[in-house]
């Protein structure tokens, strides 16, 4: 199900983390992730576990998430930004498979990918793959500030996630 958010994608990240974790759970996030990711983890009383993205030596920017380097054992949720600020796309399907195998939720901050579902010429969207996908309509889709979407694609009670931000 999909919900419109009027407090930006940050509220979607917070709702997602609060909905799928409990106090003391471990949440994996990128070392260079948006501040809202760490804030959501702290708000939930969870323990952040940081993942350092490998660097693309040619461009000097963080590369995509490398699933073979991610250890999700004991992790309750994984937060990924795709596309990244540099436009790097991670393999969301592969990440979801790893998370599912280890009982972790996958939260994708797709703030800059709101238009992905509308063209086969664009990268595949996380909307139908990840457990939670957050998109910012105001960044790439012409929405008013701070319009965003929260897509929930798991067995979590959606009303629990929404009650966290209402």
Feature annotation, model-predicted:
Residues 7-166:
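Conserved PLP-enzyme active-site core in the AAT-like
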């Amino acid at each position: 199900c999909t919900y419109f958010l009027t407090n930006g994608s940050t509220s979607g990240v917070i709702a997602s983390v609060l909905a799928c974790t409990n106090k003391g759970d471990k949440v994996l996030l990128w070392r260079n992730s948006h501040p809202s990711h760490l804030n959501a983890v702290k708000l939930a009383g969870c323990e952040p576990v940081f993942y350092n993205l490998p660097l693309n030596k040619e461009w000097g920017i963080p590369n995509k998430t490398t699933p073979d380097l991610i250890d999700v054992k004991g992790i309750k949720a994984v937060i990924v930004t795709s596309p990244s600020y540099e436009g790097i796309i991670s393999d969301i399907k592969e990440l979801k498979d790893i998370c599912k195998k280890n009982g972790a939720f996958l939260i994708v901050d797709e703030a800059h990918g709101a238009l992905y579902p509308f063209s086969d010429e664009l990268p595949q969207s996380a909307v139908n793959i990840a457990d939670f996908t957050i998109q910012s309509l105001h960044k790439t889709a012409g929405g008013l500030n701070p319009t965003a979407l929260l897509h929930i694609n798991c067995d979590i009670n959606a009303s629990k996630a929404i009650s966290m931000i209402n």
